[in-house]
A protein has these predicted regions:
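Extended, charge-rich alpha-helical interface modules
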Residues: 1-74
Length: 74
């Protein structure tokens, strides 16, 4: 996730509590989706799809914060 922006991600994780909250929640959802996909965590299809959509929304929000940080730093 955001491989080309790792330096900015690390900076935001240490300096921006909103970004950190989004990042942690994304990681938690990612783990649950992975477990559901491998059959370890039984979820119905609707719940799994909703989790995937929420995960994408979190990524979009983090991307906006990264873009804003990059723009302000330039």
């Amino acid at each position: 996730m955001f491989e080309h922006d790792q330096k900015i991600v690390q900076q935001l994780l240490s300096e921006n509590p909103d970004f950190k909250l989004l990042y942690v929640k994304h990681q938690e959802l990612n783990d649950k989706v992975d477990k559901a996909g491998s059959g370890v965590l039984p979820l119905d299809d609707v719940t799994l799809e909703n989790m995937k959509k929420e995960r994408l929304l979190l990524m979009d929000k983090m991307a906006l914060l990264i873009h804003k940080h990059r723009r302000e730093g330039a």
